[in-house]
């Protein structure tokens, strides 16, 4: 079996923020992934919805991690990296690779997700479990628990 070079895994990144203070504990480097299937009326990042756009860039884990490390001295003991979106789970392989490499450096890793791509199927759970093994905190963004209101607010069904 060939070992994966996680540093070379690529993802479509919309943008990054070097000094986030609301997406997890402490000061954080935020990676906003491109793509989301929900269309929330109150979305802060509607420019991340499209799966591809001229505003996003395909980047390697190594590239994103090197950018993040420039700001590590601001994180203190509580900060780290948060991956958000768009919807981070649409690019689960990239997020898993990024967190795997970050954990090797002792970096706290937070996943910000609405869990829309999540599926309770064995083949998905294997991939999802690999991500959870390298995730310190999940910020689960539950949009609405009433099915009718959820559709009105997000243009998508509740699926979990």
PLM segments and residue spans:
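Conserved small/polar residues in nucleotide/adenosyl-binding loops
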Residues: 158-160
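Short, basic/glycine-rich phosphate-binding loops at helix/coil junctions
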Residues: 43-48, 77-78, 138-146
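Conserved radical SAM core fold
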Residues: 88-89, 116-119, 138-154
